[in-house]
Design a protein with these regions (language model features):
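Non-catalytic DNA-binding core/recognition domains of DNA-processing enzymes
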Residues: 1-22, 81, 146
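Conserved tyrosine-mediated DNA breakage-rejoining catalytic core shared by Y-recombinases
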Residues: 24-30, 104-153
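C-terminal catalytic core of Y-nucleophile DNA break-rejoin enzymes
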Residues: 46, 133-155, 169-191
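C-terminal secondary-structure termini that scaffold catalytic or DNA-interacting sites
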Residues: 257-272
Length: 272
């Protein structure tokens, strides 16, 4: 609208004179910074932001698991927070969550999926602190569990490990050593420490786990609309920006299209 008004009021096109002659008035610019709505979608187009490759993701999670064993083997209490962080990173990935969505999860946010009984009590996840648009409250969404190993990982944390945390009596899924919820700075620093220890690209951030979730679902053949709804995007274009398909995925996609085209061309009874 702003650009249209710029065009309409540009003296080079004489629209102002024509409107004044026909209607007795002339167009003016009506869209300014102070009355324009801010773009509320994620600005994720920066080229340095990307998803993990599958190999990078495996290396990151393997290191997180090994860190738990290393700390516990030394007889230190820090193995509980280490296991919490390892599980938290996995949950952030398997549900495609943002950082704050992850840290604000409660024990009661998991539920059953009637169409996915094999997941038991962990068939769905209620995200209560989704990204809020300007002037609005947090947007909620319910995410479906996709991978079969997810329930076991969560159940182990909730039933066997979390009760040993000092602040485990609260509702938060991820209590810290000092309070009912782990802090943002702690998550960022732990993630960076693991990433650097494995020797991964510094461009990978905690949010890259969400990007990886989107990318891997698309690569595995899930419907783009399903993926969009899982991660709470209003627009398919935002989901597309998040998708960082590998060269192998693009090659396979092209091969599939070419094979289908050739098969259709050779189908008996086809007329040119």
């Amino acid at each position: 609208m702003r650009q249209f008004c710029v065009f309409l009021t540009n003296p080079a096109y004489s629209w102002g004179d024509e409107c004044l002659r026909h209607f007795g008035t002339h167009p003016v610019q009506v869209v300014y910074d102070w009355n324009a709505a801010a773009h509320a979608d994620e600005a994720e187009g920066e080229p340095e932001r990307r998803a993990f490759t599958r190999r990078e993701l495996e290396a990151f999670f393997d290191y997180a698991d090994e860190e738990v064993l290393r700390v516990r083997g030394k007889g230190r209490k820090g193995w509980l927070p280490a296991l919490r962080d390892a599980t938290l990173f996995k949950v952030a990935h398997v549900y495609g969550l943002r950082r704050n969505e992850t840290r604000m999860l409660d024990l009661t946010d998991f539920g059953r999926n009637p169409e996915g009984r094999e997941f038991g009590e962990y068939g769905t996840l209620l995200v209560r602190y989704g990204k809020a648009k300007k002037g609005s409250s947090h947007k909620r969404r319910r995410v479906l569990t996709v991978w079969h190993w997810t329930p076991g990982t969560i159940e182990e944390w909730i039933s066997e490990v979390r009760p040993g945390m000092r602040h485990s009596t609260g509702p938060g899924l991820w209590p810290s050593e000092r309070g009912p919820r782990v802090g943002v700075q702690r998550l960022d620093s732990r993630f960076a420490a693991y990433r650097d220890a494995v020797g991964l690209d510094p461009a990978l951030k905690l949010h890259s786990l969400r990007r990886s979730y989107i990318t891997h679902l698309i690569e595995d053949g899930h419907d783009p609309l399903f993926v969009q709804q899982q991660v709470g995007h209003d627009h398919a274009s935002t989901t597309a920006i998040y998708t960082c398909g590998s060269s192998d995925f693009r090659t396979r996609s092209l091969r599939r299209v070419l094979d289908a085209t050739i098969e259709a061309g050779l189908r008996p009874g086809r007329t040119s």
